[in-house]
């Protein structure tokens, strides 16, 4: 197996010291294929309030677009997936689709580069920012999460992930990003807990096989977006519950309230 072109790296608050050189990374343009692996990239935006949880995303897999949105309105799940680029529109600090229009303030986030197979992957996570606008024709105010990802993932990739926002028993505003399967190295991972906006790298947190727990978090799913596809060289088994969270997080302590998502994805691409 060829040696990956990068070593794992993590940067916070816009810091770029040690950022891998010699390979294209956002915001530079990334080639469509590198080392025989097609480029995958996406922006996923989540927004969470007491009565509504939602996500919207735009992805390209080897140049082929797919967009989706899902909204849990407190009673039922609304969702749509389309294989065309304009159904979800992403702009700096804004996401729009037919049932939603939301604005938020962009920040530097936490940026991570990791080897993956014989190539590499990049991500930037922003979490806990106020997000406002309209959802299903009603005003919305909550807190958001943004996942920007790009890279040349291995042919078979599988991960489990959780992202959310909430309030600690201390009264601190918190957010989290926990993962197993990608960007999960012991020292330079994307695992992060934000406490009043300050990011803290955290050790691995074990995921229950049924996504009912992550570390000391307990997860109560309220609605599940799931999709299974098999098309020629592409196969995907995907599950993403919206959930309420109780329990505790490193650096944040016990939660007074928590809302967010979990995800299990096993894909050949």
List the predicted regions and their residue ranges.
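Structured soluble/peripheral alpha/beta segments that form catalytic or ligand/cofactor-binding pockets
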Residues: 1-269
């Amino acid at each position: 197996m060829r040696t990956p072109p990068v070593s794992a790296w993590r940067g916070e608050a816009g810091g770029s010291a040690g950022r891998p050189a010699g390979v294209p990374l956002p915001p530079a343009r990334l080639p469509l294929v590198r080392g025989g692996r097609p480029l995958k990239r996406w922006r996923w935006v989540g927004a969470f309030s007491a009565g509504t949880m939602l996500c919207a995303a735009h992805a390209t897999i080897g140049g082929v677009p797919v967009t989706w949105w899902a909204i849990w309105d407190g009673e039922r799940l609304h969702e749509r997936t389309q294989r065309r680029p304009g159904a979800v529109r992403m702009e700096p600090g804004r996401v729009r689709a037919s049932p939603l229009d939301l604005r938020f303030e962009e920040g530097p986030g936490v940026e991570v580069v990791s080897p993956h197979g014989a190539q590499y992957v990049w991500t930037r996570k922003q979490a806990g920012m106020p997000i406002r606008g309209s959802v299903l024709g009603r005003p919305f105010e909550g807190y958001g999460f943004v996942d920007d990802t790009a890279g040349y993932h291995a042919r078979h990739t599988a991960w489990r992930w959780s992202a959310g926002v909430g309030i600690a028993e201390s009264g601190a505003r918190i957010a989290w990003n926990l993962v197993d399967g990608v960007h999960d190295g012991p020292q330079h991972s994307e695992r992060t807990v934000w406490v009043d906006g300050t990011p803290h790298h955290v050790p691995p947190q074990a995921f229950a096989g049924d996504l009912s727990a992550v570390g000391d978090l307990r997860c109560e799913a309220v609605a599940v977006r799931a999709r299974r596809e098999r098309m020629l060289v592409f196969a995907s088994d995907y599950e993403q519950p919206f959930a309420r969270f109780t329990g505790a997080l490193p650096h944040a302590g016990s939660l007074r309230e928590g809302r967010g998502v979990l995800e299990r994805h096993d894909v050949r691409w």
